[in-house]
Amino acid sequence: MAKHKTLAFFIPHRGCPHQCSFCDQRTISGTVHAPEPEEITQTCREMLERSGTLESAEIAFFGGSFTAVEPAYQIALLEAAQPFLGTGKFSGIRISTRPDAVDAAVLERLKAYHVTAVELGAQSMCDRVLRLNARGHDAQAVRTASAMLRQAGFSLGLQQMVGLYGSTLQDEYDTLEQLLACRPETLRIYPTVVLAGTKLAAYCQLGVYPALSQEEVLDYCADALCRCHEAGVRVIRLGLHDTPSLRAGMLAGYFHPAYGELVESRLYLRQLQKAAADCGKPELFVETAPRTMSKVLGQHGCNRKMLAEQGVTLRVQENAEIGRAHV
């Protein structure tokens, strides 16, 4: 999974006209406070003073639907970020927004203030799932906004939420292919988390959600990571960021503080199982890079335990000359 550096500011629910089934931005972002321009200036200055050059990092406005907030507030935040862009500073500005909050006027404004990347919260490309979860837009809105952003020269990012109410595994695989057809540069994959006070929480109480198991979602995410790699699309996040407010408000769903590592560990398990089947012996000896040892073994040694249940003893040795993606 690709590493991606951002200095993120969260704008909780300020711009969104909808209340989706899963959404409580205050809990997700860990804040109820919408930042003021002065805070943007101070935080960016402190980050530059502390870190020196940040040419590989971006200033990001996440958490809400940025282009749906009042234009004056958008401009105030973007203006506050301008002095911190350029050589030896941040490489650009990244925002997230809804697919139906993108039009020609929005693109012109973003260009004028040096926004370089726009992420669309697609969540699903199944119209039925979008309706059931009160998204307020359809899959065509994602395709249209994606095409507009690419044509205007923005780096396109898309976001998928796995395991929404009413979604099947086939819906997830179909969504992934349709998202890749939009030709994004980056993708974020968020297994759904049920937060207190949301419609999903009510569905849980009624016993009609969730429908997919933890293992199904984990296996899907592993497949998705492989498929994105094949397509040349960088997956820059797997799973929600771990915050105290998220843990406090979480009732159910597919959450782990290191979900990306779980997914990568599942991919290593598949490699190990194939190697064990190919060699046909009761003991499997592998070498791996030092930084990937924990992923090869799995959380709490789960990969080793699973192989043991299949009659294979796993022995792992570190080798600094091996690439991180290989065993």
Protein language model features and the residues they cover:
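Short acidic/His/Gly/Ser-rich catalytic and metal-binding motifs that mark active-site loops
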Residues: 16-20, 195-202, 246-248
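Short glycine-enriched loops at secondary-structure junctions
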Residues: 12-15, 190-195, 241
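Conserved non-cysteine loop/helix-boundary elements of the Radical SAM core domain that shape
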Residues: 28-42, 63-185, 189-192, 196-216
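Auxiliary Fe-S-binding modules of radical SAM enzymes
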Residues: 2-6, 207-324
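Conserved beta-strand core positions
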Residues: 7, 59, 93, 118, ...
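N-terminal pre-triad scaffold of radical SAM enzymes
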Residues: 1-29, 41, 46-67, 96-98, ...
